[in-house]
């Protein structure tokens, strides 16, 4: 998978040279300038820049075991900062400032106690509870107005380990989409592209459309005027730079949706989730840019 989005001149880490023939064939066919780095070779180099799908303590420890130097890896303090900023509370806080005008809606609540969780669930016919340190459709609990023993136990466990639970209403979703960004590690976060994706009935990621940014905007502007997406992306560059620009280096994505309200009006939910890591939207962007003809549909 990394070969599809790796920068030219990069190497993809694999367990052994078993993958070399596959990488060579694809590189020649698609013009990719990507080499193979096996796990035993990690210790032979120095001053490498590792760019994983996403950082976590287990990966850091694994690379150290393979011989990567301390200076090539993020510090333990950085890992703690990254975990804090990957928390869904960041999206809850950001959402109100992204409801820019009448085309934007959406609510999200951070619930810190079982009493708050119970009141939220029982105050709605249906709702969705999310574990704060989860993503890609995982850590979700769909509720139907009854705070059952199972839901209570789930909330208690999640709150004890992750600080709380995020509660959201159920939306009449029309389209899932995202805006992808790149943080340069020097304070600036810039727009990288759009993505349209699909999820299953439980919210799990199912796949991405391969489309150019222009065609994605055409698709989305059937629901909301195109200028509103431009307005939102500009605001997000500012907000994300303030939130993450000072420490984070790499790709990130903001999941969104078009939903239809009770008056049959289409609205943008501008911040369903923030993914402070690489994501399949970035892969779809790179595949579209490298492999699709301009008139592909």
Question: Where are the regions a protein language model picked out?
Answer:
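A short acidic-Thr-Gly-centered motif at the start of a beta-strand
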Residues: 113-125, 158, 244, 255-267
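Glycine-rich phosphate-binding loop of ATP-grasp-fold ATP-dependent ligases
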Residues: 107-108, 127-151, 178, 201-220
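A short acidic (Asp/Glu
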Residues: 20-27, 59-67, 138-141, 177-178, ...
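Phosphate-binding site of ATP-dependent enzymes
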Residues: 151-206, 257-271, 279
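A long amphipathic alpha-helix within ATP-dependent nucleotide-binding catalytic cores
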Residues: 191, 203-266
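ATP-grasp fold ATP-binding core
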Residues: 111, 121-142, 160-173, 254, ...
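Conserved N-proximal alpha/beta basic substrate-recognition cap immediately N-terminal to
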Residues: 1, 5, 13-119
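Active-site "cap" helix and flanking loop/linker of ATP-utilizing ligase/carboxylase catalytic domains
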Residues: 10, 277-297
């Amino acid at each position: 998978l990394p070969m599809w989005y790796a920068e030219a001149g990069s190497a993809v880490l694999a367990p052994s040279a078993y993958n070399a023939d596959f990488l060579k064939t694809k590189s020649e066919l698609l013009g990719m300038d990507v080499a193979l780095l096996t796990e035993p070779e990690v210790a032979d180099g120095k001053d490498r820049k590792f760019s994983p799908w996403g950082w976590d303590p287990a990966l850091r420890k694994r690379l150290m075991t393979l011989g990567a130097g301390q200076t090539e890896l993020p510090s333990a303090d950085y890992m703690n900062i990254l975990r804090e900023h990957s928390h869904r509370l960041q999206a809850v806080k950001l959402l109100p400032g992204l409801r820019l005008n009448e085309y934007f809606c959406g609510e999200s609540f951070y619930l810190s106690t079982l009493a708050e969780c119970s009141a939220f669930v029982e105050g709605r016919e249906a709702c969705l509870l999310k574990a704060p340190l989860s993503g890609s459709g995982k850590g979700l609990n769909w509720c139907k107005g009854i705070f059952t023993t199972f839901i209570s136990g789930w909330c208690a466990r999640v709150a004890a380990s992750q600080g709380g639970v995020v509660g959201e209403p159920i939306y009449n979703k029309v389209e899932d989409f995202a805006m992808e960004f790149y943080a340069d590690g020097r304070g600036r976060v810039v727009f990288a592209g759009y993505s349209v994706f699909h999820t299953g009935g439980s919210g799990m990621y199912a796949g991405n459309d391969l489309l150019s940014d222009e065609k994605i905007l055409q698709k989305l502007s059937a629901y909301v005027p195109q200028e509103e997406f431009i307005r939102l992306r500009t605001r997000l560059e500012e907000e994300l730079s303030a939130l993450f620009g000072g420490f984070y280096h790499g790709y990130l994505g903001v999941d969104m949706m078009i939903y239809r309200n009770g008056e049959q009006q289409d609205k943008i939910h501008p911040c369903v989730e923030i993914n402070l890591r690489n994501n399949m939207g970035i892969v779809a962007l790179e595949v579209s840019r490298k492999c699709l003809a301009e008139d592909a549909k």
